[in-house]
Amino acid sequence: MSRKKKSRKPGAAGAPEFMVTRNRSESDVAGRLRKKDKKRKGLKAGGRNSEEGAQQKHGSSQVRDPRLGSKKKIPLIVEPAKKLTKQERRLSAEQELEMLENDAKLNVLLDRIESGENLGRGLQQYVDEKLDRIEQLMSQLGLLEPEAEEEFEDEAPVRKSRSDDDLLADFEDFDMDDYKG
C-alpha cells in the first residue's frame, strides 16, 4: 500500500473531507479561466487615458468646463463703437468726482497734512494729482466757484514803471556800509 502524506489541516486527522468531483469539461473550463486571468495580471494598455474617460463620463453631469463648447453667438459684423453723449460723460464725471471725494486713502493723507505731518515725495505727488483732478472735474461740472482774484489785485500796491534814469539814481545813492556787520 502506498503511503499518504500527513496533512496540516485541522480536520484532516479525524473525519475525511468530501471530495468535489467534477467532470472533465468543467475542470478544463476552470483551468482556462485561471490561465486567462494569470495572463492579464497587469494593468491594461492605455489605462491612463481610458480611466480619465470613465471619470469624465461619471462627472460630466456635475462639473463642466466652461471653456469647452460655448453657445454664445458671435456677431459677424463689427459695429462701430458708440460715442458717449454729453449727458453720459457728465454722469461719468459726476461718478468719478464722487469716487475721488470718497477715496479713503486720499482722506487719510489729507488729514495727515492738516495735522502738520510732512508726506513723502510719492504720497505728496499722489495727493496733488488727485486734488488737481477733483478741481478739473468740478470746473467741468460747473461746481467750482471762481476765486476772488479781483480782491487781491486791489489790495496789492500798484507799481509804476520806472525809467532807467530813476533806477540808475537809486543805484548810485545806495550805501553798502549800512549792510556791513
From Swiss-Prot:
Q: Is the keyword Disulfide bond in the record?
A: no
One of the protein's GO biological processes: ribosome biogenesis
Give the matching InterPro entries: YihI (IPR007336)
Q: Where is this region: Disordered?
A: 1-75, 145-181
Composition bias, Basic residues? 32-43
Any GO molecular function:
GTPase activator activity
Question: What binding partners and quaternary form does the record give?
Answer: Interacts with Der.
> What is this protein called in UniProt?
Der GTPase-activating protein YihI
Q: What is the lineage of its organism?
A: Bacteria, Pseudomonadati, Pseudomonadota, Gammaproteobacteria, Vibrionales
Please state the gene responsible for encoding this protein.
yihI
